[in-house]
Amino acid sequence: MSNASYPTGVENHGGSLRIWFHYNGKRVRENLGVPDTAKNRKIAGELRTSVCFAIRMGSFDYAAQFPNSPNLKHFGLGKREITVKALSEKWLDLKKIEICANALNRYQSVIKNMLPMLGEKKLVSSITKEDLLFVRRDLLTGYQKLSNGKTSSIKGRSVVTVNYYMTTIAGMFQFATDNGYTSGNPFNGLAPLKKSKVKPDPLTRDEFIRFIEACRHQQTKNLWILAVYTGIRHGELVSLAWEDIDLKARTITIRRNYTKLGEFTPPKTDAGTGRTIHLVQPAIDALKSQAEMTMLGKQHSVEVKQREYGRTAVHKCTFVFSPQVTKQQQLSGPHYKVDSIRESWTSILKRAGLRHRKSYQSRHTYACWSLAAGANPSFIASQMGHTNAQMVFNVYGAWMKDVSDSSEPY
């Protein structure tokens, strides 16, 4: 071995080959971890030549060429270690200026559930794809944890929820990758779980009649008639004001939404903001009935948080639907909350003896009835606040094929 010929910059170190070169004015050595053979000496010499050429050309990426080199830290190129918990705190803090409070709350909830599963004290760089596969399995099939740390009797989560959790955390790990905390995102190549396409479950005409008859107050009837005959989102429904309605023109302009966090915001999508809903006669009749109860009510100034960080607007609102109509005023606010709308829906279904559905089916009922009546999908999309008709086709395509020729006109 002592008589072996070595290319310039190639040397034997403990039976293995290493190369040396100058980088940033310093002589550095890199172990190649290959045995000292004639063939390997030739390859090592070629590698060293290419490294020196890249350095001269200013295109040498030390971390890419030698990702595990102990020399990286001497040049400030090493991985920046951070724990999963510290990463989540940093990521959320930076996300605050990008997303609305409602979205931030969802992210915080995801991280609260995921941190114990990932290991909050583990280094981000140590998380592997195998770790993530086990986390995903536990999310889907394991028992959920309560806020007090105890295990609940609720087992598993839906595929939709699991995919949302994983996608959210994947974004956090991409942030880590982009900023040098890990050499690669372990979520790369991890496909979402397959999910079945859930068909809409609208109320039939007969069910809707039974539903309305089971309402205990005229305001409740008016609210659900308007919801079903407009397809309005429930956050938009509870924040609807008489200032948004033109009964003569038979239109509603959607200007705001009300979130679970108790904030007024613009509607969910840009396409849904400021959209005009054209009212059919049942909706007009419901609003005329409701006008007798609330149109002359107190006008409130509400702060609406805009999409641009830190910006707000003030809207003057005489709310169309008010819990003060049916309850003692001192115990109620000027408008409903979204959760109370859902509770109302569930209670009415029970009283009417109808099969349980989620309250969002009021929106599906509008779309399905409209399609059954031959309405243009693009028109329906604009009424519901979708960007284009593709969403209508995606969600209601299968249902459209099942519509009977005997469907009643809308």
Summary of predicted features, one role per range:
Residues 123, 188-189, 249-254, 358, ...:
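Short functional hotspots where side chains directly engage DNA or cofactors
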Residues 148, 153-159, 163-165, 178, ...:
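Basic, Lys/Arg- and aromatic-enriched nucleic-acid-binding interface segment
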Residues 13, 206, 240-317:
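Conserved tyrosine-mediated DNA breakage-rejoining catalytic core shared by Y-recombinases
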Residues 1-38, 262-263:
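Short, Arg/Lys-rich segments that mark the N-terminal edge of DNA/RNA- and chromatin-recognition modules
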Residues 59-71, 126-130, 174-196, 409-410:
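Short, charged hinge/linker segments at domain and secondary-structure junctions
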Residues 206, 210-211, 263-266, 394, ...:
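DNA/chromatin major-groove-contacting recognition/catalytic segments
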Residues 148, 213, 217-218, 230, ...:
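Short, basic (Lys/Arg/His-rich) helix/loop patches that form interaction surfaces
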Residues 26, 76-153, 172:
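Basic/aromatic-enriched alpha-helical hairpins
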